[in-house]
Amino acid sequence: MPMKPINPSQFPKPIAPYSAGAMADNVVYVSGTLALGEGGQVLHVGDAKAQTRHVLETIKTTLEAAGGGMADITFNHIFVKSWDDYKAINEVYAEYFPGDKPARYCIQCGLVKPELLVEIASIAHLSPKE
């Protein structure tokens, strides 16, 4: 089955050659998502909770554009700049996954801009359309 790009119209144009998400069959792959605004400026500098909320809202919007939602996520890839922010990131994360939790991993690493604190990429499996 061919891949269908997902680029919600309210998102700024990506600053690199990628789509916000891609769907093949009923699987949605959401690109690594950061707290970036128009023109690539970092949002919520120094605030891990606000950056995490922005990232998860962006992922939610991408999934909704594909016909799904947060409950369809089966796996999250989480990248954190510092373990000092791990607790704050998890507090916000838990708000978006109150029931069954998707599988995930979390890696500490450098991100594309020094002010960024968290990046999340997701995989979601949508129910087949009738």
From Swiss-Prot:
Catalytic function, reaction form: (Z)-3-aminoacrylate + H2O + H(+) = 3-oxopropanoate + NH4(+)
Gene Ontology cellular component annotations, sorted alphabetically: cytosol
InterPro entries reported for this sequence: RutC, RutC-like_sf, YjgF/YER057c/UK114
Signal peptide positions (record): none
Pfam family, one: Ribonuc_L-PSP
Enzyme class: hydrolase
Keyword Hydrolase found: yes
Described purpose of this protein according to its UniProt entry: Involved in pyrimidine catabolism. Catalyzes the deamination of 3-aminoacrylate to malonic semialdehyde, a reaction that can also occur spontaneously. RutC may facilitate the reaction and modulate the metabolic fitness, rather than catalyzing essential functions.
Family membership noted in the UniProt record: Belongs to the RutC family.
Listed NCBIfam families: RutC (TIGR03610)
Listed name of the protein: 3-aminoacrylate deaminase RutC
Originating organism: Haliangium ochraceum (strain DSM 14365 / JCM 11303 / SMP-2)
Gene assigned in the entry: rutC
